[in-house]
Amino acid sequence: MALYAIGDLHLSLGTDKPMDIFGGAWLGYMDKLRKGLSSITSEDTTILLGDLTWSLDLDGAEADFAFLNAIPGRKIILKGNHDYWWTTATKFYKFCELKGFTDMFILNNNAYEYEDYAICGTRGWFFEEDAAEGSHNDKIFKRELIRLETSLQQAGDKPKLCFLHYPPRYRGYECPEINQSFFFIKIQN
């Protein structure tokens, strides 16, 4: 049972916004994705770290979720900052049931088991040091901290594997508020 994580897929199978237009490493990215995802088995778990589709709603994202549904095994989904399709977990699960999509689960204020570990996480938010108290970004950031703490609490005493869309450490910057909420552990095979 392997554990995989991938984010920022920005699928556009149902919209006209392919990432190939950015050139470079993005050229042929769907073929690269298919090749990379082909090693996943039905026994594995894949964490989808947000920004899954460019679609603005679930119906428009049907082709993208069909692609994700075809990935074998369990898929655990976090929200990204470009996941405009995201409404509620209830609506997502109804959509999946209607379309026959299986083994896709939302990680939001909850936790999932993976072997002897608990999978926790949330979108997070990029912390801006110069954001004014009470600003839009400040409110989102504080809400994401609450979601992260809720997810960690839902895990109980199990060792935690924590995933975020926004990294708490990035190019020399560390987000102390998020780093205080959890600890990093190293998994050795």
Features from the language model and the residues they span:
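Generic beta-sheet signal
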Residues: 44-46, 75, 160-164
